Amino acid sequence: MKQFERIYENLDLIIFRADYIEGRSVEVAVSLQDYYYLIQHVDKEGKVENELDHIPIRISKAKKFREFLKEMKLLEWPTLRLGDKGYHDAPLVFSYGYDEEAEEGIDEAIPRNAIPSETMRRIHKELENLIGTTFGSYRFYDE
């Protein structure tokens, strides 16, 4: 398998899941390389409730968000890899490459208990600033 350098400049896809109401969640996926985002609303059974559109984001905002992740030291946090227990329940996944030979993304997940809830709240807020819209609920960070 081809090796990809795990550095901030290679960060591409950021997937953030925020809880919403009545067991629903909202997932925001942002591409820092292709400069777009999409939002999907997920019901209690895990089914996507809306059409997915790739919405462009400003290059300058994507660069600013990448710097924010660097300041937060994202790559120093404990992570899970695909196949690890809890990977699919993690609220934050980041990708830093795509292996065309293996046809898979090179990504890691930040488990819910790996960082303080205030840090997750801050990432949520910065993502809202990046995409220019609100999503999910902050109340779940206080529980």
Each language-model region and where it sits:
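Short, internal acidic amphipathic alpha-helical interface segments
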Residues: 56-93
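Short, well-ordered, aromatic-rich surface patches in folded extracellular/luminal domains
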Residues: 1-20, 81-143
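Short, cysteine-centered beta-strand-loop-beta hairpins and adjacent loop/turn segments enriched
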Residues: 45-47, 101-102
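Amphipathic, interaction-prone secondary-structure segments
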Residues: 22-32
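Short, exposed beta-strand/loop patches in secreted or surface proteins that constitute
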Residues: 28-30, 55-57, 94-96
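Short, solvent-exposed coil/turn segments at beta-strand boundaries
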Residues: 30-36, 98-100
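Negatively charged, low-complexity tracts enriched in Asp/Glu with abundant Ser/Thr
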Residues: 1-8, 12, 48-64
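N-terminal glycine/threonine-rich, aromatic-flanked beta-hairpin/loop signature
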Residues: 35-43
